[in-house]
């Protein structure tokens, strides 16, 4: 694709185009990281990018960058064409979509798929080999359901969703539109509900459901459980990494982002635009406010107010955690001094 064509496409995107300086309208074949990019490749560079030192050594034919005079001056001296936008990362994401077309799966239902007679599949859907769709399930239009996926009874799947291979969607689950569910994820399995009595565990039936709104993306090997009654709810725009566990009856707001190995226990309520870093744990029935950020391995045992940044186990305000951490490594020395004082 000619560089000028890419510029036109970026102009129509969401990265907030500023200007383009094209020294040669070269054909861009693909994209690469700035430290390994070659001729006919495009890359991107942000102001705080740790790869900025590689700029003088790159062979990239074009760079997407921000409106930074130092970077633009260096690019001009190196005769490297550049596209200037407010958000280079978004522009680069759009370029990847332009340059690398998805493998096209023609609409149709594979002969090996099993679709129960009361189930309905909409227009322009791809249903791959060995897919199972249960009784009374309704599949909307333009969905891609990849091989080995099991969709049990009374499921509602909206339009334009992608369900990758070997997912399991349990009965009564509802997934709206434009969602992506990656491989081996299980949605709507039984919540972990047992009642202790006389030294044994009595099972609490899990008869609720899972509701997932539009534009949600869920990574591989995630588990989203249904509750005994009511629903587990994930609002629109939320994104989950791999190996995330969502317990029964959890409510998650809009546009949240959860990194790998996050675990949220039953009944917790997560607000909008919450960021949970890797291995964060959230306790039962805890309420986490809007715009909260929790750093990795954080243990959230009590409610967190809107806008807080928390760290540590148990979670505390990040500034308090940093102060505590600085003291922690001095504890052996402090303990030694205390023993010496005791002897006096």
Swiss-Prot record:
Catalytic reactions of this protein: a UDP-3-O-[(3R)-3-hydroxyacyl]-alpha-D-glucosamine + a (3R)-hydroxyacyl-[ACP] = a UDP-2-N,3-O-bis[(3R)-3-hydroxyacyl]-alpha-D-glucosamine + holo-[ACP] + H(+)
EC numbers on record: 2.3.1.191
InterPro entries in the record: Hexapep, LpxD, Trimer_LpxA-like_sf, UDP_GlcNAc_AcTrfase_non-rep
Pathway assigned to this chain's UniProt record: Bacterial outer membrane biogenesis; LPS lipid A biosynthesis
Active site: 248
Gene Ontology cellular component list: carboxysome; membrane
Single GO term (MF): N-acyltransferase activity
Pfam families, per database record: Hexapep, LpxD
Biological process per Gene Ontology, one example term: lipid A biosynthetic process
Keywords on record: Acyltransferase, Lipid A biosynthesis, Lipid biosynthesis, Lipid metabolism, Repeat, Transferase
Protein family per UniProt: Belongs to the transferase hexapeptide repeat family. LpxD subfamily.
Assembly with partners or alone: Homotrimer.
Function noted in UniProt: Catalyzes the N-acylation of UDP-3-O-acylglucosamine using 3-hydroxyacyl-ACP as the acyl donor. Is involved in the biosynthesis of lipid A, a phosphorylated glycolipid that anchors the lipopolysaccharide to the outer membrane of the cell.
Protein name stated in the entry: UDP-3-O-acylglucosamine N-acyltransferase
Gene: lpxD
